[in-house]
């Protein structure tokens, strides 16, 4: 592979990564909004916003769906926790 081929291939890969990044951001936005709505529903019905066992099971399950389970175990608690921040601030 010559330098031009390398540069073209690297650019293609970067563009593909950027497209996935954009998809991830859009999906995270949707997930956070749904989770916030769920927190509000739980609050209206006097249910706890945080159920550790449910979140632990979800993380374990999601970890089985990837070749990078440590990444899920690192990211998902932050993602799920972020959705609870407004609820926790009101307590």
Task: Briefly describe each language-model feature range.
Residues 1-91:
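Domain-level signature for soluble enzymes in the chorismate/prephenate branch of the shikimate pathway
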